[in-house]
Amino acid sequence: MRVIFLALLIARKEGKGDENTIIKMALAHDLPETRTADLAYVHKVYSQTDDMRAARDLFAGTSFRDFENIHSRYEKRDCVEAKIVKDADNLDIDLELKELEEQGHKLPAKWKAMRKFVRDKKLYTKTAKSLWDKLQKANVAQWHMEANKWKKIPSAGR
């Protein structure tokens, strides 16, 4: 769900893309992985999946046949909507890593250089790069601490 909102944010900040297509693409972008698995980077070096076939099989004979084409466009990155959704998908990974880092996990530190490479070489939009930069300095739990009902409602929890 977060990918959808990130994609819409990027599209609106960039002033580009059809929002209807972006929403559908963001909904469908990972669905074939329910059949092929979400392979980690190292697994992709040694394994191949056929996400296009998985999408075709997944949507065939359903009311969502149009999603096969939407997924195909996403995989090809041949339109601005696909690039926006891919940027959102990458930012979602970075948000998850930031959340893990703030929980004390060590994995995010190990991925820092690789994710910086993704920021510099793989993100398509200026907005996504700007959001990535801001995320590195952000406290992802700050909203929760500031909106905490214990602060706003003095009698809460008594």
Model-derived segments and spans:
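Alpha-helical, largely C-terminal catalytic domains
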Residues: 1-158
